[in-house]
Swiss-Prot record:
NCBIfam families: PRK00504.1 (NF001764), PRK00595.1 (NF001860), rpmG_bact (TIGR01023). Belongs to the bacterial ribosomal protein bL33 family. This is Large ribosomal subunit protein bL33c. Its main location: plastid. InterPro entries: Ribosomal_bL33, Ribosomal_bL33_CS, Ribosomal_bL33_sf, Ribosomal_zn-bd. GO terms for biological process: translation. GO terms for molecular function: structural constituent of ribosome. Pfam families: Ribosomal_L33. The keyword Protease does not apply. It comes from Emiliania huxleyi. The gene is rpl33. Gene3D superfamilies: Ribosomal protein L33.
Length: 55
C-alpha cells in the first residue's frame, strides 16, 4: 500500500530544454502547495539554471 504522508516525490525538469535533464527530489505537500522552482546545476549548459516541477 502507498504511504499517506505529506512528503511526495517530484521531478524537476530544465526550464529551457524539456526532456534533456531532470532531477528527482521530495517536497512536503502541506507546506509547499505550489510547484517547486529551484536553481540547480545543468550539465548540458554547464551552469546553474532554473528547474521547474513537472507532473
Amino acid at each position: 500500500m502507498a504511504k499517506k504522508g505529506a512528503r511526495v516525490q517530484v521531478t524537476l525538469e530544465h526550464k529551457c530544454e524539456q526532456g534533456v535533464y531532470r532531477y528527482h527530489t521530495t517536497k512536503n505537500r502541506r507546506n509547499t502547495t505550489d510547484r517547486l522552482e529551484l536553481k540547480k546545476y545543468s550539465p548540458v549548459t554547464k551552469q546553474h539554471e532554473i528547474f521547474k516541477e513537472i507532473k
